[in-house]
Amino acid sequence: MPAISRDEVAHLARLSRLALTDAELDEFAGQLDSILSHVKVVTEVPAEDVPPMANPNAVTNVTRPDVIVPGLTPEQALSGAPAVEQDRFAVPQILGEGE
């Protein structure tokens, strides 16, 4: 006999806004009972001395020094562009009329 009844599964399905058939209710009752038995095993692990944490590994940001380096000149940046207007990339208009 599952610890979770068919009615409890139906109630959970209603709360979750899931439309389950009678066969699905019976199937999920057994599956949820099995899942809860596995969760119970995990809760029995002695962990009183383990502090609460989000991640067991230390997480640190890996950054590089913020150093200014020379970039491309405008001419170099625009050299590969298919179309240029007024020292800018020219692209097809996609929104409304131009100004």
From Swiss-Prot:
What domain of life does the UniProt record list for this protein's source? Bacteria
UniProt cross-references to SUPFAM superfamilies, sorted A to Z: Glu-tRNAGln amidotransferase C subunit
Task: Fetch the InterPro entries from UniProt.
Answer: Asp/Glu-ADT_sf_sub_c, GatC
User: What is this protein called in UniProt?
Assistant: Aspartyl/glutamyl-tRNA(Asn/Gln) amidotransferase subunit C
List the keywords (alphabetical).
ATP-binding, Ligase, Nucleotide-binding, Protein biosynthesis
Q: Which GO terms describe its molecular function?
A: asparaginyl-tRNA synthase (glutamine-hydrolyzing) activity; ATP binding; glutaminyl-tRNA synthase (glutamine-hydrolyzing) activity
Keyword field contains Methyltransferase: no
Q: Which gene encodes it?
A: gatC
Enzyme class per UniProt: ligase
Q: How does it assemble?
A: Heterotrimer of A, B and C subunits.
- Any one Gene Ontology biological process term? regulation of translational fidelity
